[in-house]
Amino acid sequence: MSDCHPVLLPEGPFSREQAVAVTTAYRNVLIEDDQGTHFRLVIRNAEGQLRWRCWNFEPDAGKQLNSYLASEGILRQ
């Protein structure tokens, strides 16, 4: 059994620090379209296909991404 625990985002907008914590915890979550102050957090499946993406400033970005992290997230070992 793995000692890895899921890392989730707040339900609303999220910071770069929070996004980096998620990308560090999951193999298939990436920061893309980085504009400095805003960026997208992207979840891809094992084949590399896009599953979901949200801008960090969207009102319910974390809530949407957390749902996909629970079903599609691949935790690092």
From Swiss-Prot:
InterPro entries (alphabetical): DUF905, YkfF-like_sf
Top-level lineage group: Bacteria
Database matches in SUPFAM superfamilies: YcfA/nrd intein domain
Pfam families on file: DUF905
Q: Which family does it belong to?
A: Belongs to the UPF0401 family.
Name this protein carries in UniProt = UPF0401 protein c4569
Species source reads Escherichia coli O6:H1 (strain CFT073 / ATCC 700928 / UPEC)
Classification from the root reads: Bacteria, Pseudomonadati, Pseudomonadota, Gammaproteobacteria, Enterobacterales
